Amino acid sequence: MKQENEMSVTVGSKAAGIGSAGRRGKAIRSDLWVQLEARSRGGIELDLSSRVEAYYGDAIRTQVEEVLAALGVTDARVRLEDAGALPFVIQARLEAAVLAAGVAPEADARPARTAALPPPPPRARMRRSRLYLPGNEPKFFISAGLYEPDGIILDLEDSVHPDAKPAARLVVRNALRCVDFGSAERMVRINHLPLGLEDLVAVVPEGPDMILIPKVETADQVREVDAAIDRILENSAAADRPLWLMPILESALGIESAFEIACASPRIAAITIGLEDYSADLGVPKTEEGAESAWARQRLVNAAKAADVQAIDSVYGQVDDLEGLKRWGERSRGMGYEGMGCVHPRQIRVIHEAFRPPAAQIEKALKIVAAYEQARAEGRGVVSLGSKMIDPPVVKQAQTLVEQARALGLAGADADEDTRPLDGDTGSEANR
């Protein structure tokens, strides 16, 4: 998603007892800029400028007073420039400004949860598309689910200015409590370690579905994140909720360690590659054809399959080139990838089409599964389709394809109801 150029740097701009947070400027919307000066007396003095003053001015003032009281701030001069921020954003910006002013909050002032936690996604759920949303730009959050990506990524890493990361962390935390992202899997890309450990403390208790770990080069880095999650969840309401991991491999060393990384934690559901950083690490430009990264991309697929996790491709950065995106997506699927990232909503439909199984493949898979079911019903160990014997790996691949087709509405749910994976002793004699 494109970021606005007009912004004020947030947490980090603080003088003695003065802190600011948020973003302001003519191009800014759905956000709030706050400057807070802590005082020893005098109560709360508010100076509010809001584009929605006529409708929500009083409500904003009331919320500001309530949040400050909850944080234990009783004496402060507060200046606010509001561009239509929602309550969860107002709370996050106020808390960030209080922290930037050097005031330690006296209590938990998180907003009440207004978005119900969706059912936890299965480890192997469909992940064709994942839409990146800059974590410090809440204007993108509200409508993101309407575009129906398989996943949304609240990004705390590359899309967020270093000085704004503490403030963005609070916005993302609150979004997980207050924004309905529809059917999308709710992912958070943390910062690379060690800063990412601070991100985990903020977001893990809110029940995200997946954590993306950037710039992973060793299995130990994954294990460090895994152990941190265990500690955070120990006394959390989200302790019984599965939390999946997706390491991002962005260097030559990361690719060389792909299999070890993919096996580093039972929480890992997928691994992916970051092509911009990978190409930079090689010292070569990233090209549309991708010849410079073809080996690494195939190496990652092989490692993922060997570890029984999903292989997810990188983003296609040319937002306006939808034909190029389609070609890239089709090649990606042909390499064994199960999805890819996207940086703009217009890419989602093209990606879904690129990763849609062709009708001929679905038809063949249905026939293979039907032949397997018939062989099992007749007590035969050999699966055949016509005069051709079908090996167990082929049946398993067909079952996976049928399940995917059903999820997409491309195959009837009543066709070949029992598609349980093959046991090791069932199947063709051809390879024995």
State where each predicted segment sits.
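Expand to "…catalyze enediolate/carbanion chemistry for C-C bond making/breaking, isomerization
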Residues: 92-96, 100-432
